[in-house]
Amino acid sequence: MSAPAPSPLAIVDAEPLPRQEEVLTDAALAFVAELLHRRFTRAVTNSSPRRADAAREIARTSTLDFLPETAAVRADDSWRVAGPAALNDRRVEITGPTDRKMTINALNSGAKVWLADFEEPSAPTWENVVLGQVNLSDAYTRNIDFTDERTGKTYALRPLKSWRPSSWPRGWHLNERHLVDPDGSFGARRVVVDFGLYFFHNAQRLLDLGKGPYFYLPKTESHLEARLWNDVFVFAQDYVGIPQGTVRATVLIETITAAYEMEEILYELRDHASGLNAGRWDYLFSIVKNFPATRPKFVLPDRNVTMTKLTMTAFMRRYTNCSSYCHNARASAAIGGMAAFIPSRDAEVNKVAFEKVRADKDREANDGFDGSWVAHPDLVPIAMESFDRCWHRPNQKDRLREDVHVEAADLIAVDSLEATTYAGSSSTAVQVGIRYIEAWLRGLGRVAIFNLMEDAATAEISRSQIWQWINAGVEFEHGEKATPIWPRKSRRGRKWRPVREELGEEPFAARDWQHAHDLVVQVSLDEDYADFLTLPAYERLRG
């Protein structure tokens, strides 16, 4: 006797949205329920204690090493991943949220890959979750346009040449409060909601277009989590009746533990892997999260100094070079970091910023990366030129980087950054965190702050540095010490005058700065480090 059909998940505490019936069908919700409850609940539940155990061991020993039990996988030169021809050229990938305007602009940008991101640049309101899925389906059927109510400007798709979409679901650690088990017992994991709805509605549609269901996998911490993803892919392909090996996934190496298991992660996903991405900012955030603030060698310097010098330090060069070597030795794509600059009306500002973007992309191309990220369409030709100038072909997977030799200690050598922490920048860290969270609580996940397109990673690194500096007792350049006092006074007086001038008095007064301030201060001053700022923020998010 065949197993009974799974019951679909129930929608709770959510106002009806236009066209939600196209996405939240009984069949799609039954697929998500099957993924979550009947197949992978135990594996997902077991992953949390494993993460906690690993974190405690790192805190105890203040070190990490490559796994001895997987040495055979690393030593075996015979295996490769099965990267598809459809993702052979990834020289420039544009990332952004799944709203209609960004969807159209990304597909019109000329980038080789569009990364439709449900995670960091998207505040997880129910409207963003559901209508993001609607927008992607409309894009793939070329049934999408948008008119900006404020400016009257109309956006429409131009004839598309070579483009490949890749979806970025939210992480395993998050629950979706609006979709629950039929008995109301617990909520669905957001990652299963994002992946499940997208895959169910678009896998066959994308194959019919000569593309495929491609994904970015965030917040992966170990090869065991990669194994879980592989099991999900196998089940999902069988469920909807498409061939095994159709799915392709790029894993973000944005946690310190994953950096020590890059080859093992590729091995577990070898039938579905297309590459790894060097998530530089989240990598640093993960170091703060895992290593004791009482150890001076792990204290990160000023964020602005780090922004300028980060990619040139021996520490980060070893991380990115290790990524490049690992990717290309296994025939997978090596994708570099984000260029987050937003073009300004000031030509001189643009000139300086474009040169920094060009230098960063030149370095990545010369280091062996096959492509890189940008956040704005105007940066696509700049990044493309860097990779075209370095090598005149779709990728450089044949460049094995046999010159790269990385020791375990190199990947956590934060003290090699050799930079100072400045008191003024500590205030900037607080302001950036508050400005981002204020927008996030209004449903915006991607925000322009100081000429950069910032997302959740910005808020995480900002509040992490505040927490770390206070707990480490950092002294700033003039001898002032980091204490709990300065985050609390960050909203007072002249420091917010530029924001008032930028927004105007009425819009500034209309926004809920106090809630954002209180939340950033709370997670910055808590004795125990909160795993993710967005977890307590989600409790305050409306919608």
From Swiss-Prot:
GO CC field: cytoplasm
Main location, first listed in the record: cytoplasm
PROSITE patterns: MALATE_SYNTHASE (PS00510)
Biological process per Gene Ontology, one example term: tricarboxylic acid cycle
Pfam families: MS_C, MS_N, MS_TIM-barrel
Molecular function in Gene Ontology: malate synthase activity
EC number: 2.3.3.9
EC primary class: transferase
Pathway membership, UniProt: Carbohydrate metabolism; glyoxylate cycle; (S)-malate from isocitrate: step 2/2
Keywords (A to Z) from UniProt: Cytoplasm, Glyoxylate bypass, Transferase, Tricarboxylic acid cycle
Subcellular compartments: Cytoplasm
InterPro entries assigned to the protein according to its UniProt record, in alphabetical order: Malate_synth_C_sf, Malate_synth_sf, Malate_synthA, Malate_synthase_CS, Malate_synthase_TIM, MS_C, MS_N, MS_N_TIM-barrel_dom
Catalytic activity: glyoxylate + acetyl-CoA + H2O = (S)-malate + CoA + H(+)
Entry-linked SUPFAM superfamilies: Malate synthase G (SSF51645)
Highest rank taxon of the organism: Bacteria
Family per similarity comment: Belongs to the malate synthase family.
Database matches in PANTHER family: MALATE SYNTHASE (PTHR42902), MALATE SYNTHASE 1-RELATED (PTHR42902:SF1)
Record note on quaternary structure: Homodimer.
Name listed for the protein in its UniProt record: Malate synthase
Organism: Streptomyces arenae
